[in-house]
Amino acid sequence: MLFQKIKAYKWQALASLVMTGLMVTSSLLQPRYLQEVLEALLTGDNEAIYTIGFWLILVALIGLVAGGINVVLAAYIAQGVSSDLREDAFRKIQTFSYANIEKFNAGNLVVRMTNDINQIQNVVMMTFQILFRLPILFIGSFILAVVTLPSLWWVLVLMVVLIVAMTGLMMGMMGPRFAKFQTLLERINAIAKENLRGVRVVKSFVREKDQFAKFTQVSDELLSENLYIGYAFSIVQPVMMMISYGAVFLSIWLVAGMAESDPSVVGSIASFVNYLSQIIFTIVMVGFLGNSVTRAMISLRRIREILDTEPAMTFNDVEDEELEGSLSFENVTFTYPNDEEPILKDVSFDIAAGEMVGVVGATGAGKSTLAQLIPRLFDPQQGSIKIGGKDIRTVSEGTLRKTVSIVLQKAILFSGTIADNLRQGKGDATVSEMERAARIAQASEFISRMDLAFESPVEERGTNFSGGQKQRMSIARGVVSNPRILIFDDSTSALDAKSERLVQEALNKDLKGTTTIIIAQKISSVVHADKILVLDQGRLIGQGKHADLVASNPVYREIYETQKGKEE
């Protein structure tokens, strides 16, 4: 997967490899030129000193310039690859159903798209900056070191075997630790996100200490894992350096006698030590980068999990003709993922196009679940749902979204402008269409008072608006597309009685022919509906007009009388 992403930057990658070749060539030539300069100094050959010195400086400059260019190329490739991965992951997430989202959870997905992709970006950059250079530099330095002083080949082999063994052991031990670290990082992000989103609840019930204790518990586990990893590397790195420096000192001690008897080998000794230093550099860097590479491999696996996940539901790709607004449930049974007990049980009913239908029942009866099945946010395990006589599982997503609009119980706004939020309901909505939607939702008054009207800014989650204003904008977003079926999932609960009545009057006047389904806690919200469905413990136990249900349905009558008593 990563290789395919890098292929999109093949010319930059090729240029980076050329720069890497120049850098390695420069590094391998410099000790050889240094050897020749030292030998020329011993013989007093000034002309050779100047000539070789010129080439030494030129080669060093070429390596320096190539290194600078390579840094730019590596950064370009790494940032491009990470951007492509992030876009692919986000595009994939957009196809996920609620079930897919719940499988990962939102905090987990955010960590994967930020922290994990940053880990991959860092390693891609290091790969083109350093990792590609290391094996070539290692092999070249090893060969040239043996050619320079063949008698010391065994010192090199011993050093390499010891360091490689330690590096392999370290990476094997740290893999599970890095995986656990990423999991803890997800948890701490999820806790922080949950706490910030629910800050009003936390403060209202004075639960700051409990939330802090929950956060610090995971934070301490995260710290413990991080310290373990740090301690492990703090032990391994000095040991590797001791092995490396031991090889240098051993080499110098072994050749010291040679220099006394034959001063001309001083250049060879200097060249050998330089090559040995480069070998040490490559091995130590591999060990040092092993931490990042191991983390990145785990991160890549986690990104692949997103990209390889198949959406829990698929849609017909062929756009359908416009559907009419009739709706029918036929023996629908639905159970949420990871739950055992169905939330809806064998529910059947028919709604004619243009009807206003209320859905009532006690908390947990399945009202909101029923609403979420209509736009196909979930699929039932049994039975079928039909709109305009067509099973919604055979309808394209585009057609279904144009036909059905839902106004959720909790008003969710996005940062941007009021117009941006209304156009979530219809991407090409005109100003006149937005004005009409705002008028129906009783939002025109407060929007018109704002200096920028529909271009007024909306902060994250709409925190610069009151609950009632957010709900009105949410309703406007739902009606702006003039859908065939409009669902209110208890979405008028944040409105006062007068505003709720005005919204219903506007709906009756401006959306004639639209099938309206109102999920309500208060029977007063649906008392004038053409039909009311009564749910109890996931079953449809009655349907009809208000007066008929009061007379014939004990559950409905009990809810009605209880609410009526409270109002009185």
Describe every region a protein language model picked out:
Residues 1-8, 109:
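A short amphipathic helical element positioned immediately N-terminal to and/or at the very start
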Residues 7, 11-69, 73, 146-151, ...:
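Transmembrane helix-loop-helix hairpins at lipid-water interfaces of multipass membrane proteins
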Residues 8-10, 95-99, 115-124, 128, ...:
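An intracellular "coupling" helix at the cytosolic face of ABC transporter transmembrane type-1 domains
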Residues 18, 26, 48, 66, ...:
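Hydrophobic alpha-helical transmembrane segments of ABC transporter permease domains
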Residues 28-32, 68, 72, 138, ...:
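Membrane-embedded alpha-helical segments of multi-pass transporters/permeases
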Residues 43, 79, 87-111, 115-117, ...:
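Short intracellular "coupling" helices and adjacent cytoplasmic loop segments at the cytosolic face
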Residues 45, 144-161, 228-302, 306-307:
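Helix-loop-helix
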Residues 322-568:
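ABC-type nucleotide-binding domain
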